[in-house]
Amino acid sequence: MIEGVSIITHLFLRATLLVFCLSTSSLLQAQLNIYSHRHYDSDKILFKKFTDQTGIEINVVKGSADQLIQRLISEGENSPADILLTVDAGRLHRAKEAGVLQPIRSRTLYRNIPASLRDPDNQWFGLTVRARVIVFSKDRVDSNELSTYEDLANSKWKGRIAVRSSSNIYNQSLMASLIEANGKRKALSWAKSVRKNMARAPRGSDRDQARAVASGIADIAIMNTYYIG
């Protein structure tokens, strides 16, 4: 954790890592083609165990989520992809709307993944969850004054909040969750208030928001948990 920065972790789990089977043609050839936006060693370990247990080789195609989804659209029915592995339910919604996914029936998936973490039509399933949280300077912010996203709209935080652009999928998913929880009108009012409270124009990555707090540019930031530590 960045020294001098505290974190609110009990807000809401919103950034889901998701996977969905696209086809089965490669399985017949003892090869599984995975289009992956992820870059974690844990995935490599999982893939190796799968190959050791089944004898099926895994071919991983790397790229950003948007690039991979666009590739699936371009390839159409001729796509060699079997699985799309990416982050955030918002991106999986885009993939579903683009028509590049198909439903899967699996008792194992149904048994291990709750309905709240999978598509209603079983076109994608959540593997892990992470939180989009509020971080703040322990020296400049009293934790008793800040415990929810709604608190960020208070005018006392004017000129003190750092956040990346609203064009980022993580913030779009956050906004979607607030619309679901509070309604569109209240969520829009909240967003306008937070904008007025920004310490600077939105820029950079989640890590840049944490750096802004650590350097004193801002007192509060919104970011994903896995960037902390």
Regions found by a protein language model. Give the residues of each.
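Bacterial N-terminal signal peptides that target proteins for export
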Residues: I2-T16
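Cleavable N-terminal signal peptides
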Residues: L18, L27-L28
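N-terminal signal peptide c-region/cleavage motif recognized by signal peptidases
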Residues: S23-S25
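Early extracytoplasmic/lumenal segment of secretory-pathway proteins
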Residues: A30-H93
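Short amphipathic alpha-helical coupling segments at ligand-binding clamshell hinges
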Residues: L46, S189-W190, N224
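Short, hydrophobic alpha-helical packing/hinge segments within bilobed ligand-binding/sensory domains
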Residues: L68-I69, L92, Q209-A210, Y227-I228
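C-terminal lobe and pocket-closing loops
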Residues: G216-G229
